[in-house]
């Protein structure tokens, strides 16, 4: 298979600096890596944070962002087994991990202190050819629509793992805060597929219609609601058994502590820069609530999330634009104007 020496990519040299759509060299895979011809990549809020550099974790610079890349394997490192040229593969947030530390050996690879992060510490999927550790790369069944599955590789895996973290039972209520965004739109669908009842929370009538079209039974509009907490408590007859916070609003996260049901679980997923959540010790103990963080997922979570998609249970509401338009997608993201998920076509 012919592999070019240069490719189109979006790269930035300083945090917050110009997003340059330009030719850069095609990377060569290390002995343990795949070289993947990325066809499509989802665009995530994490990519925005990586560009801005506003998280307490340094990025590599210069950097090619992106960590929801779906494509075709075009080259194998000399030590790679179990993959073939032409296989479909996905680039996830966890590009690689040590596989030897206490976290890796207990299936918590995302907590590995030496984890290599796509589009953050490792050049990611906003390029036509990208490398990924062969063990961590996601296996995608051949024939899959690569544009539609791209958001599953981070957003889907992340919300699926968060729902597992909430430890709910079929028929129980789960509130999805940030319901109309890229993660929220998938969280609603995974929750329905897992047998849960969904309260979607977001701002705007259009977002309410969108959330309900995906399966939300109830929608609470924080723009028109006089009391979000009271509305959720009423809709769920006592509070949500679980809350999936994919919103990037600190206030929304704080409210979730108050509308979660006694014995329920608040799951924190979204990562607004500098945000904090406080909880009354007395109330937390007496109501027996749990507040947990959930950070992407392991290899098993990834395979399970992809399986839900390939069985037709999850529909990714996407809009496809060219990779060259990435800067405008970031602008829309900052303005909170995105329904579902934007996906970039690396050929444009």
Curated annotation (Swiss-Prot):
Cofactor note: Binds 2 Zn(2+) ions per subunit.
Documented EC number(s): 1.1.1.1
Gene3D superfamilies per UniProt: Medium-chain alcohol dehydrogenases, catalytic domain, NAD(P)-binding Rossmann-like Domain
Signal peptide span: none
Keyword Signal: no
Binding site for NAD(+): 178-184, 202, 207, 269-271, 341
Catalytic function, reaction form: a primary alcohol + NAD(+) = an aldehyde + NADH + H(+); a secondary alcohol + NAD(+) = a ketone + NADH + H(+)
SMART domains: PKS_ER (SM00829)
MF terms in GO: alcohol dehydrogenase (NAD+) activity; zinc ion binding
Cofactors, names only: Zn(2+)
Residues engaged in binding Zn(2+) 1: 44, 67, 154
Protein keywords: Cytoplasm, Metal-binding, NAD, Oxidoreductase, Zinc
Taxonomy, superkingdom: Eukaryota
Location of this chain's protein in the cell: Cytoplasm
Residues annotated as binding Zn(2+) 2: 98, 101, 104, 112
Cellular component terms per the entry's GO annotation: cytoplasm
The family this protein is said to belong to: Belongs to the zinc-containing alcohol dehydrogenase family.
Annotated function: Converts ethanol to acetaldehyde.
Assembly description: Homotetramer.
Name assigned to this protein: Alcohol dehydrogenase 2
Gene transcribed to yield this protein: ADH2
């Amino acid at each position: 298979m012919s592999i070019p020496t240069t490719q189109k990519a979006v790269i930035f040299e300083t945090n917050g600096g110009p997003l340059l759509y330009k030719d850069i060299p095609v990377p060569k895979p290390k002995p343990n890596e795949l070289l993947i011809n990325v066809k499509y990549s989802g665009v995530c809020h994490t990519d925005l944070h990586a560009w801005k550099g506003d998280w307490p974790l340094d990025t590599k610079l210069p950097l090619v962002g992106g960590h929801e890349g779906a494509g075709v394997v075009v080259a194998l490192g000399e030590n790679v087994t179990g993959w073939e040229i032409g296989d479909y593969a996905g680039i996830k947030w966890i590009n690689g991990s040590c596989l030897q530390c206490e976290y890796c050996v207990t299936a918590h690879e995302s907590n590995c202190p030496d984890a290599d992060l796509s589009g953050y510490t490792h050049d990611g999927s906003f390029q036509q050819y990208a490398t990924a550790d062969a063990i961590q790369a996601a296996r995608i069944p051949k024939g899959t629509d690569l544009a539609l599955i791209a958001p599953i590789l981070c957003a889907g895996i992340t919300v699926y793992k968060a729902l597992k973290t909430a430890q709910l039972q079929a028929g129980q209520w789960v509130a999805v805060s940030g319901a109309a965004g890229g993660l929220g739109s998938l969280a609603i669908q995974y929750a329905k597929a897992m047998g849960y009842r969904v309260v979607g929370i977001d701002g705007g009538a259009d977002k309410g219609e969108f959330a309900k079209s995906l399966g939300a039974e109830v929608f609470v509009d924080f723009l028109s609601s006089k009391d979000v907490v009271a509305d959720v408590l009423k809709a769920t007859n006592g509070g949500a058994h679980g809350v999936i916070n994919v919103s990037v609003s600190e206030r929304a996260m704080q409210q979730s502590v108050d509308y979660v049901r006694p014995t329920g679980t608040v799951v924190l997923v979204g990562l607004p820069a500098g945000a904090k959540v406080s909880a009354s010790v007395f109330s937390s103990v007496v109501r027996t609530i749990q507040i947990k963080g959930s950070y992407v997922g392991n290899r098993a979570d990834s395979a399970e999330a992809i399986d839900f998609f390939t069985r037709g249970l999850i529909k990714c509401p996407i809009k496809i634009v060219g990779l060259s338009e990435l800067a405008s997608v970031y602008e829309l993201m900052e303005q909170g104007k995105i329904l579902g998920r934007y996906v970039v076509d690396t050929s444009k």
